[in-house]
Regions:
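Short coil/turn segments at alpha/beta junctions that flank glycine-rich nucleotide-binding fingerprints
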Residues: 105, 121-125
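Extreme N-terminal starter segment of soluble prokaryotic enzymes
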Residues: 3-5
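Conserved active-site alpha-helix within GNAT-family acetyltransferase domains
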Residues: 109-113, 121, 133-151, 156, ...
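Conserved hydrophobic beta-strand within the GNAT/NAT acetyltransferase core sheet
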Residues: 93-96, 127-131
């Protein structure tokens, strides 16, 4: 097993990560048909700001940097110790990511395991997450790590592609 540890992100790492995660999350939401492209990055930033009002110092949030045995960064993770839908004793994994240049070498599993330990040590009895349906690599990782589907959302477009208006999920005629 690849050796990975985690530590709290620095403020500089947090600021860089917030820019990247907002862009990634907006792209995922657009691809899933949940958001329109216009204003999506700003919306993602706003949502993250609500969840992390004190940034890296937000209580009950683990904002972590994964580090390999050589002290080099391998990825990041964000765990909320209070589940967003109130599930008792469950933390929520908002984000986990291995740096692109480091993917494919077992670091994802190693990072996930150390993040699970951090959540357990912080008092969580379970860890839940959301994974987008087209993220087959993530789905495979989570299933092989023992995660089970607890809820599932599905979508079928009835009238073409989502429009660029303001209503979430609306479709063009």
């Amino acid at each position: 097993m690849t050796n990975v540890t985690v530590r709290a992100m620095t403020r500089a790492e947090f600021d860089e990560w917030q820019t990247e995660i907002a862009e990634e999350y907006a792209t995922e939401q657009i691809a899933a048909g949940r958001w329109r492209a216009e204003g999506a990055v700003e919306r993602a930033r706003d949502e993250n700001a609500l969840l992390l009002p004190q940034g890296v110092d937000t209580p009950r949030m683990l904002v972590l940097r994964g580090i390999d045995a050589d002290g080099e960064p391998v990825g990041r993770a964000w765990v909320g110790l209070d589940h967003p839908r109130g599930a008792p004793d469950a933390a929520f994994l908002y984000d986990i990511e291995v740096l692109e240049a480091r993917r494919g070498s077992g670091l994802g599993r190693a990072l996930l395991e150390v993040v699970e330990r951090a959540a357990l040590e912080a008092g969580a009895a379970a860890l839940e997450l959301n994974v987008f349906g087209k993220n087959t690599a993530g789905i495979g990782l989570y299933e092989s790590a023992g995660y089970e589907v607890t809820t599932q959302q599905m979508r079928k477009m009835l009238r073409g592609e989502p429009s660029s208006g303001d209503n979430e999920g609306a479709a063009k005629p």
